[in-house]
Amino acid sequence: YNNIINEITKLYNADSAGSYEPLTDDEKDKMSDTEIEKWETKIKDSLLRRDTSLGTIMNSMMTAMSSPITIDGKDYSLSSFGIQTLGYLNAAKNEQNAYHIDGDEDDENTSGNKDKLMDAITKNPDTVIDFMKQLSTNLYKAMDQQMQSSSLRSRYKIYNDKELDKEYSNLTKTIKQWESKVSDKEDYY
């Protein structure tokens, strides 16, 4: 989860390309290969900045992970087991949505905290198992919901492939019409 949410957050919060536009051949001729590569990387890195589909997926994942789960009449969340994010102020850039386990010796941010997860596993393993099963199910359902078929996209796609296909067909048709008009004009003259 952490690797995925960190990557999504990084892509979503990417720096703006600002005034960077694709380079023309003339502009490329005046630049070194390194300069061209940096320029194009800046544009590519910002392609998914504030992308609505990516934002929706990110929000769905975060909601699934943070929603309380009721087991035997009691509500639990990840924080009940000492698993929580560091938040915007304490986390590294684009890692504010990643979860950390209190008492984890390998995590310098939370290693000094009490290990609530181990306590819960020792005292009531069935509750922890039930919670984790339900959490996994909730996350799966949230992602499945995002990948449902719609008038704009096919099932298991998170981008609007049907819409893109329709736009591609329309543009191809328009290009053919203009090519035909140009050909007719050339034949006329």
Language model segments and positions:
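Structural flexibility/helix-modulation signal
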Residues: 3-176, 180-181
